[in-house]
């Protein structure tokens, strides 16, 4: 009888370990103003640019509180990116196009990736680099190409 109970306990344990977990259960609930469609886009661009999803959410929450049409002075959209910064990352449209959530995420998360690299994986530091700019830090670390700011390094020691 003891052997049967032991076998049953092991079988239950193995079955529980083998069950597929629901990835949606790992996602935090939607933030105020966030929609499922917006969450999908955020995750898509975070994964594409290899930036932690929580970092992208942190920047969006800080910059626009999940409002794609947010404007503050010269800054546009979800991640409050400057049109000049977006152009530096490859954007070729009109500034108002940055009020489209997907367009904003495409260029702003690309820029955030550089802040993430310069921060050496420190999320709070990455937010600060994103907000104040990281060109000179990337230049001094020979990371202009890696961060996407330039197609070649400008410092002679980096070439």
Segments predicted by a language model, with ranges:
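Catalytic and binding regions of secreted/periplasmic enzymes and modules that target cell-wall glycans
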Residues: 109-152, 157
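Solvent-exposed loop/turn segments at secondary-structure junctions
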Residues: 64-67, 85-88, 133-136
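Export/targeting segments at the very N-terminus of extracytoplasmic proteins
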Residues: 18, 24-61
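C-terminal motif of bacterial Sec signal peptides marking the signal peptidase cleavage site
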Residues: 13-16
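Substrate-binding/active-site groove segments that recognize
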Residues: 74-91
């Amino acid at each position: 009888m003891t052997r049967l109970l032991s076998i049953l306990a092991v079988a239950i344990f193995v079955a529980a370990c083998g069950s597929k977990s629901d990835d949606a259960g790992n996602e935090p609930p939607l933030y105020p103003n966030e929609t499922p469609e917006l969450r999908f886009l955020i995750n898509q661009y975070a994964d594409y640019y290899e930036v932690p999803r929580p970092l992208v959410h942190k920047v969006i929450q800080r910059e626009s509180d999940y409002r794609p049409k947010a404007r503050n002075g010269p800054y546009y959209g979800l991640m409050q990116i400057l049109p000049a910064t977006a152009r530096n990352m490859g954007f070729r449209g009109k500034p108002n196009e940055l009020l489209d959530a997907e367009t904003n995420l495409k260029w702003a998360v690309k820029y955030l990736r550089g802040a993430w690299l310069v921060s050496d994986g420190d999320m709070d530091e990455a937010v600060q680099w994103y907000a104040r700019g990281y060109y000179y830090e990337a230049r001094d670390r020979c990371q202009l190409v890696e961060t996407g700011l330039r197609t070649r390094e400008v410092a002679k020691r980096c070439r």
